[in-house]
UniProtKB/Swiss-Prot annotation:
This is Zinc finger protein 786. Residues 9-80 form the KRAB domain. A zinc finger (C2H2-type) spans 192-209, 240-262, 369-391, 397-419, 425-447, 453-475, 481-503, 509-531, 537-559, 565-587, 593-615, 621-643, 649-670, 676-698, 704-726, 732-754. GO terms for cellular component: nucleus. Signal peptide: none annotated. The gene is ZNF786. Gene3D superfamilies: 6.10.140.140, Classic Zinc Finger. InterPro entries: C2H2-ZF_domain-containing (IPR050636), KRAB (IPR001909), KRAB_dom_sf (IPR036051), Znf_C2H2_sf (IPR036236), Znf_C2H2_type (IPR013087). The keyword Electron transport does not apply. The keyword Ion transport does not apply. Belongs to the krueppel C2H2-type zinc-finger protein family. Residues 141-164, 285-364 are annotated as: Disordered.
Amino acid sequence: MAEPPRLPLTFEDVAIYFSEQEWQDLEAWQKELYKHVMRSNYETLVSLDDGLPKPELISWIEHGGEPFRKWRESQKSGNIICSSVDMHFDPGFEEQLFWGSQQAMNSGKTKSHFQLDPESQCSFGSFVSFRPDQGITLGSPQRHDARAPPPLACGPSESTLKEGIPGPRNLDLPGLWDVPAWESTQHPWPVCGESCWENNHLVMHQRGHSKDRTRRAWEKFNKRAETQMPWSSPRVQRHFRCGVCGKSFRRKLCLLRHLAAHTGRGPFRNADGEMCFRHELTHPSHRLPQQGEKPAQCTPCGKRSLPVDSTQARRCQHSREGPASWREGRGASSSVHSGQKPGSRLPQEGNSHQEGDTEALQHGAEGPCSCSECGERSPMSARLASPCRAHTGEKPFQCAHCTKRFRLRRLLQVHQHAHGGERPFSCRKCGKGFAKQCKLTEHIRVHSGEKPFRCAKCGRNFRQRGQLLRHQRLHTDEKPFQCPECGLSFRLESMLRAHRLRHGGERPFSCSECGRGFTHQCKLREHLRVHSGERPFQCLKCDKRFRLKGILKAHQHTHSKERPFSCGECGKGFTRQSKLTEHLRVHSGERPFQCPECNRSFRLKGQLLSHQRLHTGERPFQCPECDKRYRVKADMKAHQLLHSGEMPFSCECGKGFVKHSKLIEHIRTHTGEKPFQCPKCDKSFRLKAQLLSHQGLHTGERPFHCPECDKNFRERGHMLRHQRIHRPERPFACGDCGKGFIYKSKLAEHIRVHTKSCPAPNELDIKKRLSQLFAMIEADWS
């Protein structure tokens, strides 16, 4: 191919002029930046040709004049004037220019890239690229109408593609070539006669006719994405450049994928044999339209794609078979024309793998592959593996750091961000980072309070769609997650995973302080607050603080007197669902918690834990004032009230109690109620402990054993009273003579000796005294 002749280039070919109105609309720093670029262009041309005369524009700039021209004067002189100019600079220059930074004037950068908008209402437009290391590239536009001025000083081109459309030419500078013009006659606009390559480009071009011609070039460029030509530079910086072909990328991963094309490992090669591609669909999309090449047209829908070679790829979207590379993960599976959603279930038909079946998938045809479990169809076998793994439970992608497994590779990649600490998406309000864009979108709703997902049955709103789906299972009573070992079903998959850990006895999350294990990490975080004393949840009405949010919500019901959970049998109300569940065991008699040592069963788990401390002798709760220790925390709190003298529970008779249960027992003395009845002798008692002690008379059982003298007792109180005999201590001492006594009643009798105030006993006192005496004799001789 013969080299095109070199043509001269003048400063006017690369100069950009503004009208007076446009110049007045520019800001001061924008004017200075424009002057800086024009001077840089002139200095480069002077370095190539010392005899170049100084243009009038440069003289204006040097003398401090206003470098603008009037429209009519510029038409007479043949200069280029455009009412709407797109100015494209290199990424660093461009970002400083359009974001208000004046550092561009002092940055020392000399690269610039001007491009006249091909859709704007210009008298003439050109594509000018100025790079000191590559020379100057000038490209002529496609438009050729009566308003275009005479050709530039560089002279006519020797080759043209069509009448009135200039072809490629070599300018009179080393390494400078004219950019080939794109021919597109598919979407003409009758107003100006200009054609656009894509239909959406034509729509954007039509908007240019309705815009004000005096709109500032800077505003026009700020929306350059709407009219950007294929060769224009994006605003996002591309730091990673290919050393082979010079192509730039925003991310290093994209550059590495691109470099694989130069290694020759790909099975598909372009027409020039220069690059290889790993996917067949990537191969035709690499080629840009050449001069005279028309866009390819899709047979089913008539839509045109870029190169002719991509017709086959586009038909693959419509046909049920398609090439193997398309079926393996590069093709789109959405039915554009039929409205069929990706992955939706289509009706079963015959064999969908027949060769030559060109019925359009996007026009309502089926995909070639279907899932044997649920019948879900997919045009790609690789995509089909995803729904199948949902049924088989297969998770082939394993994390190298924590051995977690995933069904999809992309889920593994997102998970790996957690190990690397990488959270590329951050919230602007609170700075919290996220590994996925969708998680950031969900988090933003926390600040905005938006809850777009509404339950159709109860009207409750949710921030996330997953929360709505989980909530709807409450209405349908759906429990899709079943344990394969015991058959129990659960609403949530996380509940099933936690349940399965119980079968294996595995507790992967353990406390570093006490060694206690948990099945959930959130439970471990809640437990750590026990050691740290942290109570982050505060009541707004009484300033009480709580470790758990659920306890705070239950506490808030006490202020409103609201008890939303009520028993269906007795009507008793509760502030929490868990308390109602515990109460229902009273009616059903269920005791699911059994002690492994004595086989005793309990209604509540806390009761079992407290009981097990009897076997171990553990007393973890210590009074900070007198160092007494207790098995139950409630007993320790009641004991602390004795030190403070506080009696929060008082009876109408004025007597106070430290426990609510003691108040209830005391009230029965006023009412005469005896709810505990012996099933053998029909005798009734006020207290449950009295009933248990009485039942020992019928059974002869004496479960409480003295370790000193091997005596047995029916009641624990009798055993404790007896153990004082073996101790040398006399806790009750007389204040007058200092004599000590084991029992307080003995001290009271002794005090009467000193006061000589022994009244004659009445009949009631005699009976009470005799009963106490018989009980002591029975305890000592049994």
